[in-house]
Amino acid sequence: MLFRIDFEMGIYPDRVQVADRRSGRFVDFKSEIPFSAQGRLIADPLYFEYALVKAIRKVMSGGFILLDAKVKVLPTAPALRQSERDAVVNALRNIGFKAIRFESDHPSPVAA
């Protein structure tokens, strides 16, 4: 059976947490290559995307389809700068997510 992807994601210094909202599976992944720097949560978007892909692969089990893949990004402390938000959106779109919602925003998702 194939399932649509519906994830929740938290971003921390050099760490990504991903939860599958359907199954309840949760992964807390410490990045092998640091993507944060002093005062910046996402200093290196490429290493952030690499960590995110590895975390997502660990949380997935069973069959998934990327049709209408959704992700909710939890608020961060400190709040993401616009360049960091753009890095998150770009990474998630590169992975295949279509609906990206930042919980700190209005309820409408970022459409593809």
Language model features with spans:
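Nucleotide/phosphate-binding catalytic cleft detector across ATP-hydrolyzing
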Residues: 1-16, 21-112
